[in-house]
């Protein structure tokens, strides 16, 4: 039976999520978004209203298609008594051995999640990202396009691993970090902030 899905966020990321929903054989009911002057339809589905209108669609499942982790968290905590949809593209490889994916998470095309990995709620595992064995990703983490996490990595809540970044095995990254594009993390990161370069170092504020 097809699931009926309402997507929160009529944006580029929302288009991708809509495509994943359709590829999984489910149906997009429409989008909720607080932006002004939106068209009546987006990505082939209707704009249903503002986010606060979600209660009209309680028979559907919901997914937040917004890249910013703090905004995803705010919306997830605001919406009460909803069923969260987990979007996994059919081309993604998700191990069946002791692997868990939290509600509201998006797993995009050609992503790989290996055995023993634990993915939190409302995460984004972007196109072609690799999450190796026994990783732990806390809620609201975003692993960007082509990023690679070696085995037994722990990523704290709301941390963003940038496009093409790599994390060595057995590393821990604390919450609320941004790891820049192409950065290579070879040591534990214990202080929130932005980290760039090879090896990754904290970017000092000016």
Describe each model-derived feature in a short phrase.
Residues 1-3, 176, 206:
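Short, low-complexity, intrinsically disordered N-terminal peptides in bacterial proteins
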Residues 18-20, 74-78, 119-120, 190-191:
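Short amphipathic alpha-helical segments
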Residues 25-28, 44, 59, 81, ...:
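A generic structural signal for alpha->beta connector loops
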Residues 36-95:
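Phosphate-bearing ligand-interacting subdomains
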Residues 88-203:
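Structural signal for interior beta-strand "rungs" in well-ordered beta-sheet cores
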Residues 1-56, 105:
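Hydrophobic, well-ordered beta-alpha structural blocks that scaffold small-molecule cofactor pockets
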Residues 9, 62, 84, 132-133:
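Generic structural signal for conserved hydrophobic packing positions in ordered secondary structure
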Residues 12, 70-71, 100:
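Short alpha-helical
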């Amino acid at each position: 039976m097809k699931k009926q899905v309402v997507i929160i966020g009529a944006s580029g990321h929302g288009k991708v999520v809509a495509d994943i929903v359709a590829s999984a054989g489910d149906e997009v009911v429409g989008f909720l978004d607080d932006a002004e002057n939106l068209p009546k339809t987006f990505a082939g589905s209707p704009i249903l209203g503002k986010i606060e209108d979600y209660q009209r669609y309680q028979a559907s499942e919901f997914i937040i298609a917004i890249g910013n982790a703090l905004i995803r968290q705010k919306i997830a905590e605001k919406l009460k008594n909803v069923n969260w949809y987990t979007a996994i593209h059919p081309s993604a490889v998700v191990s069946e051995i002791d692997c868990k994916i939290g509600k509201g998470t998006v797993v995009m095309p050609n992503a790989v999640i290996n055995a023993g990995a634990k993915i939190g709620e409302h995460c984004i595992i972007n196109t072609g990202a690799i999450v190796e064995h026994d990783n732990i990703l806390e809620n609201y983490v975003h692993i960007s396009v082509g990023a690679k996490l070696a085995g037994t990595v722990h990523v704290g809540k709301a941390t963003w691993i940038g496009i093409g970044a790599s994390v060595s095995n057995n590393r821990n990254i604390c919450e609320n970090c941004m790891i820049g594009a192409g950065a290579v993390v070879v040591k534990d990161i214990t202080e929130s902030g932005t980290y760039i370069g090879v090896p990754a170092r904290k970017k000092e504020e000016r």
